[in-house]
Swiss-Prot record:
Pfam families noted in UniProt: ICL
Listed InterPro entries: Isocitrate_lyase, Isocitrate_lyase_ph_CS, Pyrv/PenolPyrv_kinase-like_dom, Pyrv_kinase-like_dom_sf
Gene name of the encoded protein: ICL1
Source organism of this protein record: Pyricularia oryzae (strain 70-15 / ATCC MYA-4617 / FGSC 8958)
Origin organism lineage: Eukaryota, Fungi, Dikarya, Ascomycota, Pezizomycotina
Subcellular locations according to the entry: Glyoxysome
Swiss-Prot/TrEMBL keywords: Glyoxylate bypass, Glyoxysome, Lyase, Magnesium, Metal-binding, Peroxisome, Tricarboxylic acid cycle
UniProt GO molecular function: isocitrate lyase activity; metal ion binding; methylisocitrate lyase activity
Name by which UniProt lists this protein: Isocitrate lyase
Record-listed E.C. numbers: 4.1.3.1, 4.1.3.30
Residues that, per the record, bind Mg(2+): 177
KW Transcription (keyword) present: no
Involved pathway(s): Carbohydrate metabolism; glyoxylate cycle; (S)-malate from isocitrate: step 1/2
SUBUNIT field: Homotetramer.
Length: 547
């Protein structure tokens, strides 16, 4: 009969402290690797080890993470780039593996094509948070399968014949979209755990508020304070450390185009928050509440808000100070005073900036950032590249790479961002979204399109990606084939699909072999002693027509 006080056989109490100390030493040794030379951890090895269980699990994600780091480190040092695109499904991941050294999993694509609720929708991160990890698993399992299949094929051939066979690296590291983390810090940690368990090598997380998250190229984006996003990055690193994995964390900022922020609590955000400079106006929220109570609705309310905004003369505090300096008759050499103010106020809180302005003899300034707040309570912010740089510098010690979401494929803006970040952290790796939301034809001529990736790489953008290329290429060939098929029947399949597959040597033309039928036949034969009357690739298989 079992004892009520059974001892855990995995832990000998007399050795528990020694085992703990040994594991702490191992973690400290791990963290001393050059891989972590720029990484800041606000927690200790003791804290990490105490959160681990007794069973040590080796995650494939760790091997993939190390591989990804080696790729990006090498590319960055050479001012080169790894570039890829959003992968939809296993067929695509096997074809990408021939030519590209990383794979991207897009939250946008997953939202529209692979939600774990089966309910499609736009990129608002309102799908279950298992959605993107499940897509990572879908692709990673395919990578593992095709790697096994290829290895079996090669080892089944004489060594002298193997040079004629494919030797594709199917295990390309996967970087996935973690959106805003789908909740609080424990949600971020659980999401990170899921990604690691599913095989991701890296994840990116953005500084938007979770409940109002938008695609990077939609309006209405609401930022969280810098401190909150740093906490998310720390949560990712802590969870990966608990699991013993070198997972890459990429910090994305949406500050370039953001117009709102949840709170003014972080002084690092103060310089970018907009305030009303018209003292004659009542707070917007009060005005709107009164209008609603009087029966105003819809367009009437919008007109009232638009009129208030036009009169409010919203400005950043620094801009308000400079305007007062330039218009004040009591200030001599306004240009010099403005320069002194801007230099002294950089990075300061609003309270400190007010004190600096006063010390320079600037008249008292009316600046009220509470007055323009939205009905949800959000503060208004003037984003821009300078705002994104400010955030990127704050995130850098906690992120392996940084990405600024932008409105256009603007090389000069990309250069400004890179130079701003590298002025403080010269070794910071950068990422860039080669978005299909951009109109590339109007953005730049074709010769510049061809060199754009290379030019960005020279600035330190060592990982670049087209988020939705999988979606768009699938839509394009589907539309083209469906139209032709409806018009000319099987001729469309021959001309648009099968013949090009054969001419280009696309392995999927032999789809039975591609799917692993030969490999699975060999599994059956192994189990049945070498003979199987039901082998899928035996006599009669129609794929013989393609030899």
């Amino acid at each position: 009969m079992a004892s009520k006080n059974m001892v855990n056989p995995a832990v000998e109490p007399s050795m528990e402290d020694d085992l703990f100390a040994r594991e702490v030493a191992e973690v400290k040794q791990w963290w001393s690797d050059p891989r972590w030379r720029y990484t800041k951890r606000p927690f200790t090895a003791e804290q990490i080890v105490s959160k681990r269980g007794n069973l040590k699990i080796e995650y494939p994600s760790n091997a993939q993470s190390k591989k990804l780091w080696k790729i990006l480190e090498g590319r960055f040092q050479k001012r080169d780039a790894s570039y890829t695109y959003g992968c939809l499904e296993p067929t695509m991941v096997t074809q990408m593996a021939k030519y590209l050294d990383t794979v991207y999993v897009s939250g946008w694509q997953s939202s529209s094509t692979a939600s774990s609720s089966d309910e499609p929708g736009p990129d608002l991160a309102d799908y279950p948070y298992t959605t993107v990890p499940n897509k990572v698993s879908h692709l990673f399992m395919a990578q593992l399968f095709h790697d096994r299949k290829q290895r079996h094929e090669r080892l089944s051939a004489p060594k002298s014949e193997r040079s004629k066979l494919q030797n594709i690296d199917y295990l390309r590291p996967i970087i996935a979209d973690a959106d805003t983390g789908h909740g609080g810090l424990t949600a971020v940690m659980k999401l990170t755990k899921l990604f690691i368990e599913k095989g991701a090598a890296g994840i990116h997380i953005e500084d938007q508020a979770p409940g109002t998250k938008k695609c990077g190229h939609m309006a209405g984006k609401v930022l969280v304070p810098i401190s909150e996003h740093i906490n998310r990055l720390v949560a990712i690193r802590a969870q990966a450390d608990i699991m013993g994995v070198d997972l890459l964390a990429i910090a994305r900022t949406d500050a370039e185009a953001a117009t709102l922020i949840t709170t003014s609590i972080d002084p690092r955000d103060h310089a970018f928050i907009l305030g009303c400079t018209n003292p004659s106006l009542q707070p917007l929220a009060d005005l709107m509440n009164t209008a609603e109570q009087s029966g105003k609705t819809g367009d009437q309310l919008q007109a009232i808000e638009d009129e208030w905004m036009a009169k409010a003369n919203l400005k950043r505090f620094d801009d308000a100070v400079v305007d007062v300096i330039n218009s004040s008759s009591s200030i001599r050499n306004p240009k010099d005073v403005a320069a002194k103010y801007l230099q002294a106020a950089k990075g300061k809180s609003n309270r400190e900036a007010r004190a600096i302005a006063s010390s320079l003899g600037v008249p008292e300034i009316f600046f009220d950032w509470d007055s323009p707040r939205t009905r949800e309570g959000y503060f208004r912010i003037k984003g821009g590249c300078d705002c994104a740089i400010n955030r990127a510098i704050a995130y850098a010690p906690y992120a392996d790479a940084i990405w600024m979401e932008s409105k256009l494929p603007d090389y000069e803006q990309a250069k400004e961002f890179a130079e701003g970040v590298h002025a403080v952290y010269p070794e910071q790796k950068l990422a860039y979204n080669l978005s299909p939301s951009f109109n590339w034809k109007t953005a730049m001529p074709r010769d510049e399109q061809e060199t754009y990736i290379r030019r960005l790489a020279g600035l330190g953008y060592c990982w670049q990606f087209i988020t939705l290329a999988g979606l768009h290429t699938t839509a394009l060939i589907s539309d083209r084939f469906a139209r032709a098929y409806s018009e000319v029947g099987m001729r469309a399949y021959g001309e648009l699909v099968q013949e090009p597959e054969m001419e280009l040597g696309v392995d999927v033309v032999k789809h039975q072999k591609w799917s692993g039928a030969t490999y699975v036949d060999e599994l059956q034969k192994m189990v049945t002693g070498g003979v199987s009357s039901t082998a899928a690739m035996g006599k009669g298989v129609t794929e013989d027509q393609f030899h």
